[in-house]
């Protein structure tokens, strides 16, 4: 079996991670003691991807939980599925990172990192054939961003040929905790560009807008945002957890979605959007799901796909539905909006169907797209970064932990390069490609 090792770090990472395990335990028929109580063989067929079967037939998540303070972990432990995790896999410090990336990456986090790596190694040795890691973290704080990216680079050193998937929550002024979020996020992106293979971008701004506009919640809480995230994470990973053809492991997902190695930041969408506790009363049709899923209002990242072009995209439909109808609808979308897809990557939209729908829905769909419009989000963070950095605001918090201003400048230019690369491929046409090739041939001759 091809196992995936799940790692969650920091307050946000642990909260969305805990929700993710609640959701997938439900889907696989695992109760809160780890016993199987489901009703379908499909639930068990690929259960080993995320769970380790322990003595007495209990299923234990392949999860490592880390934080620099004990608070969030205590609440995970006392939560509904807190007893299902391996007690040794909780690794925490006492000091906290104080929303400071440098503390998470260089000082406090660096002291704790070896204990985390020990647990990661132990879990990896338990695997038959480890396919990769998935990391849940936010980029606005100190632990998830600083220590999270430190762990990613350490794992990269030790397991260079394994896939690294991240679920990264980007900060937003609308749902802001601290003033230094743009610093932390930029320093993290600098790391993720180099060390992660695929990043599912979750963006607090977009999640907030979905709760407010679509779900009509007057004051969205983090619980509401996390409900959306967990539904999306469940959808993105469903093809890894249930038998199926398309994107059945992390590497195949990457092959289908990443045309250029640095451009691995994906927008994710989900349909139908439901608020916590309310289930849909009316079954949706495939055309409605498809239409909702491609709608920019459903994207979990505050960038409008209509302002850019899709390099690649992939859709996972869940529930009992006709594959033929799914393919027709997806073709329909591409034909009607052909200007929004780059023409120089043929067959760049894939779709798959998984028979098991999420709990409480007849059918649902999840969308993962590699769109050049995601540069809007990087631009937004970059502008906030520059506004503070050119006045050297709050820098002493970072230099005091031994960082150099140079590192900020590098991170800033790396992020701006990323934006420029997205722009370059957005403007590229098939003619450019042919022209460049001809030039190269002439040079060779």
Swiss-Prot record:
Keywords: Cytoplasm, Cytoskeleton, GTP-binding, Magnesium, Metal-binding, Microtubule, Nucleotide-binding. It is found in: Cytoplasm, Cytoskeleton. Its cofactor is Mg(2+). InterPro entries: Beta-tubulin_BS, Beta_tubulin, Tub_FtsZ_C, Tubulin, Tubulin/FtsZ-like_C, Tubulin/FtsZ_2-layer-sand-dom, Tubulin/FtsZ_GTPase_sf, Tubulin_C. It comes from the Eukaryota. GO terms for cellular component: cytoplasm; microtubule. One of its GO terms (molecular function) is structural constituent of cytoskeleton. Coiled coil: none annotated. Mg(2+) binds at residue 69. PROSITE patterns: TUBULIN, TUBULIN_B_AUTOREG. One of its GO terms (biological process) is microtubule cytoskeleton organization. Residues 429-445 have a biased composition (Acidic residues). Signal peptide: none annotated. GTP binds at residues 11, 69, 138, 142-144, 204, 226. Residues 421-445 are annotated as: Disordered. Gene3D superfamilies: Helix hairpin bin, Tubulin/FtsZ, C-terminal domain, Tubulin/FtsZ, GTPase domain. Tubulin is the major constituent of microtubules, a cylinder consisting of laterally associated linear protofilaments composed of alpha- and beta-tubulin heterodimers. Microtubules grow by the addition of GTP-tubulin dimers to the microtubule end, where a stabilizing cap forms. Below the cap, tubulin dimers are in GDP-bound state, owing to GTPase activity of alpha-tubulin. PANTHER family: TUBULIN. Dimer of alpha and beta chains. A typical microtubule is a hollow water-filled tube with an outer diameter of 25 nm and an inner diameter of 15 nM. Alpha-beta heterodimers associate head-to-tail to form protofilaments running lengthwise along the microtubule wall with the beta-tubulin subunit facing the microtubule plus end conferring a structural polarity. Microtubules usually have 13 protofilaments but different protofilament numbers can be found in some organisms and specialized cells. Belongs to the tubulin family. This is Tubulin beta-7 chain.
């Amino acid at each position: 079996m091809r196992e995936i090792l799940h790692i969650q770090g920091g307050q946000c990472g642990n909260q969305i991670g805990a929700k993710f395990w609640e959701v997938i335990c439900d889907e696989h028929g695992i109760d809160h003691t780890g016993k199987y109580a489901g009703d379908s063989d499909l639930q068990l067929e690929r259960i080993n991807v995320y769970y380790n079967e322990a003595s007495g037939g209990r299923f234990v998540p392949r999860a490592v939980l880390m934080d620099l303070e004990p608070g969030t972990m205590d609440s995970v432990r006392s939560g509904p599925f807190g007893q299902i995790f391996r007690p040794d896999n909780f690794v925490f410090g006492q000091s906290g990172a104080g929303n400071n990336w440098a503390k998470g990456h260089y000082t406090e986090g660096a002291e704790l990192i070896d204990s985390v790596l020990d647990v990661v190694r132990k879990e990896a040795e338990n695997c038959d054939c480890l396919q990769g890691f998935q990391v849940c973290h936010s980029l606005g704080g100190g632990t998830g961003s600083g220590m999270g990216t430190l762990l990613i680079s350490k794992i990269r050193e030790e397991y260079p040929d394994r896939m690294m998937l991240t679920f990264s929550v980007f900060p937003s002024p609308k749902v802001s905790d601290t003033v230094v979020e743009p610093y932390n996020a930029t320093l993290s992106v600098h790391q993720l560009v180099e060390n992660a293979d695929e990043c599912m971008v979750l963006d607090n701004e977009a999640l907030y807008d979905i709760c407010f506009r679509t779900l009509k919640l007057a004051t969205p809480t983090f619980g509401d945002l996390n409900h959306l995230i967990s539904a999306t994470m469940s959808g993105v990973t469903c093809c890894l957890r249930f038998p199926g053809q398309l994107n059945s492991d992390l590497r195949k997902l990457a092959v289908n979605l990443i045309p250029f190695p640095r451009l691995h930041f994906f927008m994710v969408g989900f349909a139908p959007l439901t608020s916590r506790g309310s289930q849909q009363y009316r079954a949706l049709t495939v055309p409605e799901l498809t239409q909702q899923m491609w709608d920019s209002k459903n994207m979990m990242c505050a960038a409008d796909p209509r302002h850019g072009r899709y390099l690649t995209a992939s859709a996972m439909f869940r529930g009992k539905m006709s594959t033929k109808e799914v393919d027709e609808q997806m073709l329909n979308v591409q034909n009607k909006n052909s200007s929004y897809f780059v023409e120089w990557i043929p067959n760049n939209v894939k779709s798959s169907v998984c028979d098991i729908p999420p709990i409480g829905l007849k059918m649902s769909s999840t969308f993962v797209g590699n769109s050049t419009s995601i540069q809007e989000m990087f631009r937004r963070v970059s502008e906030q970064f520059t506004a503070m950095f050119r006045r050297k605001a709050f820098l002493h918090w970072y230099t005091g932990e031994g960082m150099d201003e140079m590192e900020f400048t590098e991170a800033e230019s790396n992020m701006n390069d990323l934006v420029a690369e997205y722009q370059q491929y957005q403007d590229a046409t098939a003619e450019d490609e042919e022209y460049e090739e001809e030039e190269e041939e002439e040079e060779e001759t």
